[in-house]
């Protein structure tokens, strides 16, 4: 089998061959129950669930591919709600003609991330559509996790809280911009795509009170902060010079006229907690090499009008607006 055919979606021999020869070598060990339409699992306590669809182009990019992204993306959405990711449901929409070697490469990435995340697969589905109906491969995932750090909400921001960022921003969006065919900038910049739970677990197990937590994906830092300000009816002030930014990312943004605060991340989170707890939180985060750039970038203030303010090194302030329009389609 060199490529996916429409017959691979007929539910018969060709479908079974696709599943057994292509999917199962990579995913079999993670599947909870075979030959069942709806596997069962036992649960007690509070759980969180997140569904996401992945349509990124190109399928393989610097620092990852759609396989790595779909596992990390769904698991991260559960993690930033204080949950430990446990189960994943996956649906694959395959375009007729999709090369089997490419599909296997993506499945291998999924396998690698499932190992890292210690995730099990509850259900798995494949559909094949005629050529041109989708662009090679779309993946839908639903992640289920158990809440181990309750009380996290975008409505819990109050005056006196600090805003922490876990790493340099905008690397995913900037790297995707640079490698798109219409731009083609030469760069070694990679996406920051990664699992966040290993970074967050020590915080969750500490006695720190986390008020708000979000992964800064589509819309970037600007989107997260504006959503928080509107949900909690507060003013958030961010100091521009404190926001960690790679020189290469900064250069791409300057060349293309982009604002890094609005670009997507796939392995960066934003955290709000009491100012007195910020040093301990940073100490915990920086014990992991992947969070060595974590820092306080601003704070929360009372205001009759929800807003996000960006203050530069000279003390001048401007409103950091919610991103508008489509900067770059299909980044995740």
Walk through the language-model features, giving the residues of each:
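N-terminal amphipathic/basic leader segments beginning at the initiator methionine
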Residues: 1-22, 320-328
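Phosphate/diphosphate-binding glycine-rich loops and adjacent basic-rich segments that engage nucleotide
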Residues: 146-192, 311, 330-332
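Glycine-rich phosphate/pyrophosphate-binding loop regions near the starts of catalytic domains
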Residues: 5, 13-165, 171
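Helix N-cap motif at beta-to-alpha junctions
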Residues: 272-279
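Flexible, glycine/charged-enriched surface loops at secondary-structure junctions
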Residues: 30-35, 118-124, 207-216, 237-240, ...
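Solvent-exposed alpha-helices and their adjacent loops that cap or buttress functional pockets
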Residues: 31-33, 40-44, 114-115, 130-136, ...
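Acidic, Ser/Thr/Pro-rich beta/coil linker or hinge segments at domain junctions
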Residues: 287-332
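Active-site-proximal betaalpha loop/short-helix elements
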Residues: 95-97, 189-265
């Amino acid at each position: 089998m060199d490529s996916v055919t429409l017959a691979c979606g007929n539910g018969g021999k060709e479908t079974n061959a696709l599943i057994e020869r292509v999917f199962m070598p990579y995913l079999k060990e993670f599947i909870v129950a075979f030959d069942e339409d709806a596997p069962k699992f036992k649960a007690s306590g509070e759980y969180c669930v997140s569904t996401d669809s992945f349509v990124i182009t190109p399928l393989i990019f610097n620092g990852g591919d759609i396989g790595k992204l779909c596992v990390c993306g769904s698991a991260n959405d559960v993690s930033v709600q204080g949950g430990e990711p446990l189960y994943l449901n996956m649906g694959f929409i395959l375009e007729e003609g999709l090369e089997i070697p490419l599909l296997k490469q993506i499945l291998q990435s999924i396998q690698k991330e499932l190992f890292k995340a210690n995730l099990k697969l509850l259900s798995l589905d494949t559909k094949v559509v005629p050529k041109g109906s989708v662009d090679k491969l779309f993946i839908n995932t639903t992640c289920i996790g158990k809440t181990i750090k309750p009380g996290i909400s975008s409505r819990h921001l109050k005056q006196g809280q600090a805003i922490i960022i876990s790493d340099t921003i905008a690397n995913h969006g900037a790297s995707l911009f640079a490698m798109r065919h219409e731009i083609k900038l030469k760069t070694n910049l990679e996406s920051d795509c990664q699992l966040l739970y290993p970074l967050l677990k020590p915080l969750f197990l500490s006695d720190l009170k986390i008020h708000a937590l979000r992964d800064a994906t589509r819309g970037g830092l600007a989107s997260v902060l504006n959503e928080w300000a509107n949900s909690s009816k507060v003013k958030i002030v961010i100091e521009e010079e404190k926001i960690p930014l790679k020189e290469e990312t900064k250069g791409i943004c300057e060349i293309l006229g982009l604002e890094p605060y609005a670009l997507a991340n796939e392995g960066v989170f934003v955290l709000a907690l009491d100012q007195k707890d910020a040093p301990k939180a940073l100490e915990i985060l920086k014990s992991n090499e992947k969070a060595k750039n974590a820092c306080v970038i601003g704070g929360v203030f009372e205001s009759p009008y929800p807003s996000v303010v960006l203050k530069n090194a000279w003390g001048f302030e401007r409103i950091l607006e919610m991103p508008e329009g489509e900067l770059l389609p299909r980044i995740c």
